[in-house]
């Protein structure tokens, strides 16, 4: 039997999957690991799904349902202040496919892409899968986990760098980049003629701040490629529906690539997506307010316990320092799971600069978070 490809063997193992598998198998475990809403998909969308299933299913157009792309244009103009046409939009199987096909369509072998570190665990492997080179941009707690543009500029190789990936609001950090820093990053992208890949999966889950889309900035139409998903805003994770908006030439190339990978996003999901974009924002706001309540509680408890944690302003994660207790974040998470039955994600899942930290998700009901914090406190007291 032939072996496994070198490409696959060089991919990092997803530690998060192993830990969460153990959490599912042991009913005593409280998991603060999930990266998905704990809410049901809104009832109007569930009811509509049942209705359209009876109409049958067929393959869809590779670029996506035209009615959905029109609805996305309206949403982008209203919510994100991004001007677009249906030709600038590709509907995908979640934002992860959007990220992957954008890299496939824009990068050649050995091109470099700057990725945030700590950053969403998909970025580095996605870049490597297209035989390009991820260049980690260190984010620091003492800088508020905000991108340092001087450090960013120093990483750029005029011949090799082709793009920068940013994520606002951030997974795992919860940071929300303001307009000023986005304008500085945008100026760098224009100066060096780079794509600015903007992952905005958590755009609707912002607290105390305002979400700004880089694609709304003046003069960025030919540079910004923005990724969105229905998973977080509408609790539609299982529908696998997302979309990307960017320069028309690149989007057409992405459509060609996507055609040979998935053919099209699920047609049922796309029809539900049209319905979702017509819904009242009250459904998203109910989730956002509940996450906000949990956010304030868990951050206060983590700091009381002795795990320094900055207040996140978006998404539904905290990123806490544990280096004063144990240098190895994976060992800390593994021991916490084994001894205290609490599952968290080690910071190294998000890059080497995540060492010494753990990520907790507050996409878990508050009563469980309270129990998990009590268990964590007992665990930490034994470590001190």
Residue ranges of model-derived segments:
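N-terminal small-domain helix-loop-helix segment of the aminotransferase-like
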Residues: 2-94, 101, 277-279, 382-384
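Conserved core segment of the aminotransferase class I/II
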Residues: 222-292, 296, 300-302, 378-380
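PLP-dependent enzyme catalytic core of the Aspartate aminotransferase-like
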Residues: 154, 326-328, 335-344, 350-384
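Conserved glycine-rich beta-strand-loop-beta hairpin in the small C-terminal domain of fold type I
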Residues: 274, 290-299, 309-322, 354
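Helix C-cap/helix->beta junction micro-motif
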Residues: 26, 130, 159, 191-192, ...
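Conserved PLP-anchoring active-site segment centered on the Schiff-base-forming lysine
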Residues: 105-127
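A short helix->loop->beta-strand "cap" motif at the edges of active sites that frequently abuts
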Residues: 111, 132, 191-194, 220-222
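Active-site phosphate-binding strand-loop segment of PLP-dependent enzymes
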Residues: 135, 139-208
């Amino acid at each position: 039997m032939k072996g496994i490809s070198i490409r696959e063997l060089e991919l990092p193992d997803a530690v998060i999957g192993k830990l969460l598998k153990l959490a599912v198998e042991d009913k005593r475990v409280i998991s603060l690991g999930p990266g998905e809403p704990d809410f049901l998909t809104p009832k109007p969308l569930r009811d509509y799904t049942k209705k359209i299933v009876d109409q049958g299913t067929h393959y869809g157009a590779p670029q996506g349902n035209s009615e959905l792309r029109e609805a996305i244009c309206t949403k982008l103009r209203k919510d994100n202040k991004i001007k677009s046409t249906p030709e600038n939009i590709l509907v995908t199987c979640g934002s992860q496919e959007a990220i992957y096909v954008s890299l496939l369509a824009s990068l050649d072998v050995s091109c470099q892409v700057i990725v945030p570190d700590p950053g969403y665990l998909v970025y580095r492997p996605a870049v490597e899968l297209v035989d390009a080179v991820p260049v980690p941009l260190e984010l620091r707690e003492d800088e508020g986990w905000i991108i340092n543009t001087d450090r960013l500029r120093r990483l750029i190789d005029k011949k090799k760098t082709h793009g920068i990936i940013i994520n606002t609001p951030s997974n795992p950090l919860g940071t929300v980049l303001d307009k000023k820093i986005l304008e500085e990053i945008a100026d760098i992208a224009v100066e060096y003629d780079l794509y600015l890949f903007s992952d905005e999966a958590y755009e609707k889950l912002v607290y105390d701040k305002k979400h700004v889309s880089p694609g709304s900035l003046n003069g960025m139409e030919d540079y910004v490629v923005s990724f969105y998903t229905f998973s977080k805003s509408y609790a539609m994770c299982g529908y696998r529906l997302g979309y990307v908006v960017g320069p028309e030439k690149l989007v057409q190339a992405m459509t060609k690539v996507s055609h040979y990978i998935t053919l099209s996003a699920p047609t049922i999901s796309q029809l539900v997506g049209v319905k979702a974009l017509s819904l009242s924002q009250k459904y998203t706001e109910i989730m956002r307010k509940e996450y906000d309540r949990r956010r304030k509680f868990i951050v206060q408890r983590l700091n009381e316990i002795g795990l320094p944690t900055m207040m996140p302003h978006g998404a539904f994660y905290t990123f806490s320092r544990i280096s004063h207790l144990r240098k190895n974040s994976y060992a800390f998470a593994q021991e916490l799971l084994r001894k205290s039955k609490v599952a968290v994600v080690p910071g190294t899942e998000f890059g080497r600069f995540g060492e010494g930290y753990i990520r907790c998700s507050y996409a878990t009901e508050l009563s469980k978070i309270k129990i998990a914090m009590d268990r964590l406190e007992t665990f930490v007291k034994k470590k001190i």
